Each structure stands twice: as C-alpha cells, then as structure tokens.
Regions:
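S-adenosylmethionine/decaboxylated-SAM
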Residues: 49-57, 67-234
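Membrane-proximal basic amphipathic "stem/tether" segments
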Residues: 1-54
Length: 234
C-alpha cells in the first residue's frame, strides 16, 4: 500500500495527466496482492528455465495482469519485443498467443542500471531458454539496438512489448518507432511505468509514456495503466 501512495506522489510530481492517474487508481484493487496468481502462471509456463538470478524475476510480477488483460484477445500473430534479457517475456507471449511468432531485439550489453551484470551469461541463458522456439522459426533473434532494428525493419506487428533502454530519450524514440509499425487494433505493452531509477523522476520511462499518451490520445481505443501500460491502437 505504501508503494502505491509513493507512486501516486511521483506521478503527480512529474505532471501526469489526471485521466492517466485515475486509470492507475482504478486498476489498483484488481491488481493488488496478485502474486500468488502470478506464481501459479509462472509455474505453468516456465520449465527448466535458466537464470543468472532466480530472485530477479521482474516480468513474472505482471503475469496475472497480462493474462487477465489479454484473456479474450485472439488475433495476435506477429509480435515484436524490444528488450529480451533471458527470454521470460518472449516465452510468455508465445505461449499466451497460439500460432504467433516473435522478433526479439536486444543488444545483450545492458544499460545504466546493469553495471555488475554478466551479459554474456544473460545472452547464453536467453539462447538456451528460447532454443525450441528459435529452432522452430517461432522466434527470431536480433542482436542490435532498437534504432538499428527499426531502420531495417519492413514488417508490421499485432503486439509490441517495449522493455529496452529505460532512459527517457530512448523510451521516446522506441515509442514513436513502435507506433509506426503497430497495426491498427494492435497493442503496445510498455514495461516499467513505475520504475524510478533516476533521481530526476522525469528521466524515467513514465514521463515519455505520459507525453506519448497525450499526443496520441485520439488514436488510442483502450488504455490500461498499472506498473505496465497497455495501449490499443484505434
């Protein structure tokens, strides 16, 4: 509960639009204390998963939230993921959406918050965890920056998951580039909306996400705000 009020304070401090704040408040109770539900989903999805630290399963905290919000969505076939780490999110999306395929973009070199992380091992774990999907052409790995990927990309996607470089400038670029290749009716899933790593709160992902929502509100048919933000394009 304390974290909830801290998040509210920070959102107000950075000038978050009231309709976004009210959306976050509305989603508080449905997503409060759902760790047991997420844990059950985690146990069902991940088998023989290799990780550099089994206590750092950030994506797994959102498993129930994502499962509930995409429960009735069936038309997701082409998925793009910006930031893949060890493969948890990619595996979830492939298992949640039948007959889908995913493009995974990551440098596997980390960013500001990853000073002490062994990314050679992280990448090795990703390759192990996703080997079945790679060998069956369900997952394509792109070891490059998201900027380089978008320069070469000529595909459009039904769902795009953004969890790459968390600096505000790069988040802004990733949002614009992702929106341009997202199909009408497609979904943009934005991770770490409540990530407050930088002391200047406006340098964290929430600020560019807020600005993006305001600028594109007329082309957004559905908005769900929690620790992850889900946007459906009109």
């Amino acid at each position: 509960m304390t974290k909830f009020f801290k998040n509210l304070y920070r959102l107000i401090l950075i000038g978050t639009p009231l309709f976004v704040i009210s959306n976050y408040i509305r989603n508080f109770l449905p997503n409060y204390k759902t760790k047991k539900k997420s844990k059950k989903i985690e146990n069902d999805i991940y088998e023989n998963f290799k990780s550099i630290n089994y206590n750092e399963k950030w994506f797994c905290n959102n498993l129930n939230y994502l499962t509930v919000n995409f429960k009735t969505v069936k038309n997701v076939k082409k998925i793009l993921e910006i930031g893949s780490y060890e493969g948890r999110s990619a595996i979830f999306f492939l298992k949640n959406f039948s007959n889908s395929n995913i493009s995974c973009v990551d440098t596997w070199s980390g960013s500001d918050e990853h000073n002490s992380v062994n990314f050679q091992l992280i990448e090795k774990n990703f390759d192990f965890n996703t080997s079945f999907y790679q060998s069956n052409n369900l997952l394509t790995k792109y070891k490059m920056t998201s900027n380089d990927f978008f320069k070469k990309n000529d595909k459009y996607f039904d769902l795009i998951y953004v969890d790459g470089d968390h600096s505000s400038d790069q988040v802004k670029i990733d949002l614009i580039n992702s929106w341009n290749v997202l199909k009408n009716g497609g979904f943009l899933v934005l991770d770490d909306y409540m990530w407050w790593y930088y002391k200047d709160y406006k340098k964290n992902p929430s600020t560019p996400i807020n600005n993006f929502i305001k600028e594109n509100i007329l082309n957004i048919s559905k908005l769900t705000v929690w620790h992850q933000v889900i946007i459906q394009k009109t």
